[in-house]
UniProtKB/Swiss-Prot annotation:
Residues 493-656 form the Helicase ATP-binding domain. Residues 678-854 form the Helicase C-terminal domain. PANTHER family: ATP-DEPENDENT RNA HELICASE, ATP-DEPENDENT RNA HELICASE DHX8. Residues 254-281, 421-442 are annotated as: Disordered. A motif (DEAH box) lies at residues 603-606. The gene is PRP22. Acts late in the splicing of pre-mRNA. Mediates the release of the spliced mRNA from spliceosomes. This is Pre-mRNA-splicing factor ATP-dependent RNA helicase PRP22. The keyword ATP-binding applies. It is an enzyme of class 3 (hydrolase). Present with 907 molecules/cell in log phase SD medium.
């Protein structure tokens, strides 16, 4: 099939030769393009106007090519030239043959013919050129002249030839010294690289860029700077007599090819060091800092003593009286001139003073989104926190805010012991006893160090044998039949067939997640489309898919697959697909009707994540449009009526589980310290109650570890007077082998107590639990709009959560639930249900997705629980400032591109800016590193060594560039696992970052963007990140460390940051972490002018009348060690003197 036939077939959607021939006949019969379009439209075949033009133009192009080819065939001379080209250079192109023939006819001699071909870099050697000229004898050439008008070269080709001729005429005959040329890296060696130089008429013009001339910084390996085949700009610095050319890449802008101005500033210029990491880009060069008053005084003294020169400090010339005795200079002619006779130009001084002034940046409050001017809620605060408690001033909420004294005391006790042990180590190291064996001394020091590392409870836990929970010898088919859901298989299948929407309620461990998808597949539902199942967490999606693949008997990615962010393990044969709810939400962006699926199951719907809530509305809409689509909602809670009501009052099916009565015991009075009360309750149960294990719900890792340590010490103190008590922790950060211990049967005569987070409410089921201790608190994630962060805070749980915790005690037999709060608090201070995530989290990414789907009226969107209006307005304002929304609130072209990336809008904004700034390769790498967990790890027994290794990766400009250093060096080490072990890096996290980078690169390729490297230019990378994170900027404050410009929140640099202990005037942060105070995480220094350049709509330069300067307070110097901070005042000094002399006023 010809190219034109393939094109027509692709447009009409058929490979039928009869249809293609029919279309070709219409083209032949049509006199012109307009007639052809009319004939096509009469057919009503659904072919667009643009496709009609494409077909017609392709047909005409093919005809022109055939004409040229026929002319070549009909001309004996053309055939001979074509044969020579075919034999000598393996080229069989009639257009090239006609082109060579036209040059031959215009040339008066062989010399002129040879020059013309060489000028155009035709690649033909002299022997081939001579052969062609010999073929055309003079009589034949004259004969061909008459034929020439009928064999005209097409106009486009002729214009291109003229353009090439002009380019060739402008080329240098040979390389010119100190001129910059474009080149291509041909070969890389240990001492540099060889570059093919373009822009000269010489063939194969090569030169060497020595390793010392490859970068302004010191280069250890040429591969760090260039790669083979890369196009670069080079300067010719030397041409030897033997023709060898030396090249340089130093001080050359690799984007424009311009020579940068050499940095001639003194290295010792007031501490302004010529840092190896500093960019030479003069456009982004850091301006000189203005001198402070103490510095001015000190410099004036140095100049007066002759130790410094006034010429080094031009800004002080107008302040210092010039003394002719030491400020005399010689003119070029040898005459002496006094320093006070020549004055600096006033305009120049003023310009220099302007340059040294620091830029003061403040918010631009005048420019806001016009479409939100009338939308502000009356009486609502701009940064109002989401309401997550029923009674904010209630006793439970006050207990949550104040925290536990027991935890605080335990923390302080550990710190005191640590200091004592450190003091003993120092004493042992300083005391050199000559009678003592040095080996014994070293062992004593090591024993003391080990006490610093682990507590008694941790040491006991380390000595336990590692196991992986309960094992079973049953075959997989028998295991499936033991699950509670198996007995309801036929009822479930029939319910799915009869209803479009279905709600299934089943306890954790009933088998609903792994079995229902298989039942539907076995019953043939997958014949009409995939069976999809969403999970709220990535780990769950991957692990469940692997388990189901094992049960089905296939490899993951074939019949059963999974999709999580930046990882798609599915294939064309996949029938059952597990995925995170966020990934299905992204699929809805491209396919709103979910046409690939026959059944979609929203698992763990009771968790009410933001993505799940959005999917409720999207799937409800898709199912109404597609009656054959089935939607199943599964939940582990009994409160399922709300789901049923939302999905058009659909049926609810309960999977029965083993449930026994549970006795609820409330506290008689409010507990002052819920941790102390929980520990006392555990001891009381262990001593006074019958057999059965205990489950205690706590809020997080620190509480769990502290409780385990305190309880271990108390049980050890009681000794044999009580039975054996096994203490087990459960939280997500624990290794899986330690977590799995909770599932092992308790040894006879013992009791186990499990301290767990709310993961034990629904996600896991522990057999043997008869007693539940519920303090009534949990950590909840909320969005703090003022700080622009999501933070975990301790808050009272809801009544639904309390009932779910109670139910954990009734799985094995009749149980008891000890609620460490009053019955009044349960009914009066707890909300009925937990506040859904969509009502307490940042919605910027969610709203961007909805806007990309064409949903502009968000107030009318069918949310199950609509988010607060102020939360939506904050998200819309953020998107407007990121330029993804226009003045009418509609998605811009930039916003459409941002929605294609599965990441936060700030990251996608930086990513797209990197394309314009030509540093996309580095930005993709850094974003990949930010998308994974912390790549550094600090083993407790080797913390100093780990910190030392980490410091080697530190970049002086901050953490974003530090992460780039880590990935680049790991890449240079060939992605070695051993390299990670040596440098205390998480190999698994780095491997994940590499996968994420690969996925982002694929998205880049898919949408036609290029990955370009800027060779780690720090200024370019930092400025690119500012384009996305300009709202996360902070300015140094002399009293509190830093204050965010947007919101004025007092923050500090996190101790793990590479900038910790350093002071930059302006910094940018990725997020804020709330621990003992609010810390900026992933911090990078920036220049204030960048904020004004990339976000003039958000920031403006401050002046004398600006609000920030008006509010600024002059705070006097003080001695932070002095008891009386007013001791420096004159009045204080006078009073002290009077007291000493006994004078009374």
């Amino acid at each position: 099939m010809s190219d034109i036939s393939k094109l027509i077939g692709a447009i009409v959607g058929s490979d039928d030769p009869v249809i293609i021939e029919f279309v070709l006949n219409i083209i032949n019969k049509s006199g012109n393009l307009q007639e052809f379009i009319r004939n096509i439209q009469k057919l009503d075949a659904g072919i667009s106007y643009e496709d009609s033009i494409k077909m017609y133009n392709a047909f005409l192009g093919k005809q022109e090519e055939e004409k040229v080819r026929n002319k070549v065939k009909s001309s004996p001379l053309s055939q001979k030239i074509n044969q020579v080209l075919k034999d000598d250079v393996n080229l069989d192109d009639p257009v090239v043959t006609e082109f060579v023939l036209s040059i031959l006819n215009k040339s008066k001699s062989i010399t002129e013919f040879q020059e013309q071909l060489n000028l155009m870099q035709s690649g033909l050697d002299n022997e081939t050129i001579f052969k062609i000229y010999q073929i055309a004898s003079p009589p034949v050439m004259k004969e061909e002249v008459s034929v020439l008008p009928s064999t005209k070269i097409p106009a486009k080709i002729e214009a291109k030839i003229e353009e090439e001729v002009q380019k060739i005429e402008s080329l240098d005959p040979s390389p010119v010294l100190h001129k910059v040329y474009e080149g291509k890296v041909r070969n890389i060696t240990t001492f540099g690289c060889f570059v093919q130089i373009f822009g000269t008429r010489m063939k194969n013009c090569d030169g060497l860029v020595h390793i010392s001339e490859m970068s302004d910084q010191r280069t250890l390996d040429p591969h760090d700077v260039v790669r083979q085949g890369q196009h670069i700009f080079v300067e010719v610095i030397k041409i030897q007599n033997n023709g060898k050319i030396s090249l340089s890449m130093k001080n050359i802008d690799q984007h424009s090819g311009e020579i940068r101005k050499r940095n001639t500033e003194s290295v010792e210029d007031r501490g302004r060091s010529n840092d190896a990491h500093t960019s030479r880009n003069m456009k982004n060069k850091i301006k000189r800092r203005a001198l402070t008053s103490p510095e001015r005084w000190e410099i004036r003294q140095l100049i007066a003593s002759g130790a410094a020169s006034i010429d080094d400090y031009p800004e002080l010339k107008d302040e210092i009286p010039i003394n002719t005795s030491y400020l005399t200079a010689k003119r070029d002619d040898g005459s002496i001139v006094n320093g006070n006779t020549e004055k600096v130009d006033s305009k120049l001084e003023e310009q220099q003073r302007d340059e040294t002034d620091e830029i003061d940046v403040e918010l631009n409050t005048d420019d806001g989104p016009k479409f939100l001017k009338d939308q502000q809620v009356k009486g609502a605060k701009k940064y109002e926190m989401p309401k997550i408690t029923k009674v904010p001033r209630g006793f439970m909420n006050r207990s949550a805010i104040n925290g536990s004294n027991a935890i605080r005391d335990h923390r302080e006790e550990k710190l005191r012991k640590k200091r004592e042990i450190e003091q003993q180590i120092r004493k042992q190291q300083s005391f050199d006893d000559p009678t003592k064996n040095k080996k014994d001394s070293r062992n004593e020091i090591q024993m003391l160090k080990n006490q610093l590392i682990v507590t008694e409870w941790e040491k006991n836990r380390m000595n336990e044998s590692i196991s992986y929970g309960k094992r079973t010898s049953l075959p997989i088919s028998a295991q499936r039949q033991t699950l509670p859901v198996y007995a309801m298989r036929s009822e479930l299948i029939q319910a799915v067939r009869d209803n479009q929407f279905l709600v299934i309620v089943g306890e954790t461990g009933s088998g609903k997640t792994t079995q229902i998808t298989q039942y539907l597949d076995e019953e043939g539902f997958s014949n009409y489309g995939m069976i999809g199942c969403t999970q709220p967490r990535r780990v769950a999606a991957v692990s469940v898919a692997k388990r189901v693949a094992e049960e089905v008997g296939c490899k993951v990615g074939h019949d059963v697959g999974y999709t999580i962010r930046f990882e798609d393990v599915t294939g064309p044969d996949t029938r059952i697909k597990y995925m995170t709810d966020g990934m299905l939400q992204r699929e809805a962006l491209l396919d709103p009707e979910m046409s690939k699926y026959s059944v979609i199951m929203l698992d763990e719907a009771h968790e009410r994540t933001v993505a799940t809530d959005v999917l409720f509305a999207l799937l409800k809409k898709a199912a109404i449009k597609r009656p054959e689509l089935k939607v199943i909602v599964t939940s582990a809670t009994l409160n399922s009526a709300k789901f049923s009501e939302y999905f058009l009052n659909c049926p609810i099916i309960n999977i029965p589980g083993k449930t026994f009565p549970v006795e609820v015991l409330y506290s008689q009075t409010p507990q002052m310290d819920y941790i102390e009360a929980a520990l006392d309750c555990v001891i009381d149960i262990h001593i006074n109650e019958g057999p059965g294990d205990i489950l205690v719900f706590l809020t997080g890792q620190e509480e769990i570890d502290s409780c385990c340590e305190i309880l271990y010490d108390r049980v050890k103190t009681l000794g044999d007077s009580i039975g054996e008590l096994l203490i087990l922790p459960v939280y997500s950060a624990l290794p899986s082998e330690i977590q799995s211990k909770i599932f092992e049967p308790t040894p006879k005569g013992s009791r186990k107590v499990v301290f767990a987070t709310n993961i034990a409410e629904t996600s896991i089921t522990i057999d043997g639990i008869y007693y539940v201790v519920d303090p009534g608190f949990a950590k909840i994630n909320i969005y703090n709009a003022r700080a622009g962060i999501e933070q975990l805070i301790v808050s009272p749980i809801s009544q639904a959560q309390a009932n779910q915790r109670k139910g954990r005690a009734g799985r094995t037999g009749p149980g008891k639930c000890y609620r460490l709060y009053t019955e009044s608090a349960f009914y009066n201070e707890m909300l009925e249900n937990t506040v859904p995530e969509i009502q307490r989290q940042n919605l910027s990414h969610t709203i961007l997705m909805l806007k990309a789907m064409g949903i502009n009226d968000l107030l009318k969107f069918d949310f199950m629980d609509p988010p607060p209006k102020n939360l939506m307005l904050n998200a819309l304002t953020e998107l407007y400032h990121l330029q993804s929304l226009d003045d009418e609130g509609k998605l811009t072209n930039l916003g459409k591109e941002m929605s294609l990336f599965p990441m936060d809008p700030t990251l996608s904004r930086s990513l797209l800016s990197s394309v314009d700034n030509q540093c996309s390769d580095e930005i993709v790498t850094i974003i990949s590193m930010l998308s994974v967990q912390n790549v550094f790890y600090r083993p407790k027994d080797r913390q100093l060594e780990a910190d030392s290794k980490k410091a080697k990766f530190h970049h002086p400009y901050g953490d974003h560039l530090t992460l780039l250093n880590v990935y680049t060096r790991w890449q240079q080490a060939n992605y070695s696992e051993q390299y990670c072990k040596t440098n205390f890096l998480h190999f698994r996290h780095l491997k994940r970052a590499r996968d994420v980078k690969s996925q982002i690169s694929m998205i880049f390729k898919k949408i036609g963007l290029k990955l370009i490297s800027c060779h780690s230019d720090p200024d370019l990378i930092r400025k690119t990140f500012v384009s996305g994170f300009f709202m996360n900027a902070a300015k140094r404050d002399s009293q509190v460390g830093y204050k965010t410009i947007n919101g004025g929140t007092e923050v500090g640099i996190h101790p793990s940051s590479s900038l910790y202990g350093k002071e930059y005037e302006y910094v940018m942060y990725h997020s804020i972490v709330l621990t003992s105070r609010e810390y900026m995480s992933q911090v990078t220094s920036i220049e204030p002018q960048w904020l004004l350049e990339v976000a003039p709509h958000f920031y403006k330069a401050g002046d004398a009348e600006s609000q920030s300067r008006k509010k600024a307070k002059i705070i006097p110097l003080h001695n932070k060690f002095a008891k009386d901070q007013n001791s420096w005042r004159l009045s204080s000094i006078r009073q002290s003197r009077e007291r000493a002399l006994g004078i009374k006023r």
